[in-house]
Amino acid sequence: MTNNENSTNLLKVNKARLKWACRRGMLELDVLFIPFVDEAYDELSTKDQFTFERLLTGQDPELFAWFMGHEVCEDTELNAMVQLILKRVKV
């Protein structure tokens, strides 16, 4: 296997892992995260990709409150990612 094939396989594995992490206990979050990974994740900078992955470590009730506008995330990077996802994903 060439280095290019190895890189492609690693990207596919990472994308599959991300999509699995996007499957939440709340459908409202699933319909935001899964399309975002499919349509926008690859276009993000490495820093923003890490920020998105950090966002996925949050608890569902907290994430739901941020995305529904009930609360504002105090972490500026995470808040910017929430806003980007809301802008990119039309629900």
Curated annotation (Swiss-Prot):
Protein task: An FAD assembly protein, which accelerates covalent attachment of the cofactor into other proteins. Plays an essential role in the assembly of succinate dehydrogenase (SDH, respiratory complex II), an enzyme complex that is a component of both the tricarboxylic acid cycle and the electron transport chain, and which couples the oxidation of succinate to fumarate with the reduction of ubiquinone (coenzyme Q) to ubiquinol. Required for flavinylation (covalent attachment of FAD) of the flavoprotein subunit SdhA of SDH and other flavinylated proteins as well.
Keywords: Chaperone, Cytoplasm
InterPro entries, sorted: SDH (IPR005631), SDH_sf (IPR036714), SdhE_FAD_assembly_factor (IPR050531)
One cellular-component annotation, GO: cytoplasm
Similarity field: Belongs to the SdhE FAD assembly factor family.
Record-level GO BP terms: succinate metabolic process
Main location: cytoplasm
Cellular compartment(s): Cytoplasm
Protein name per Swiss-Prot or TrEMBL: FAD assembly factor SdhE
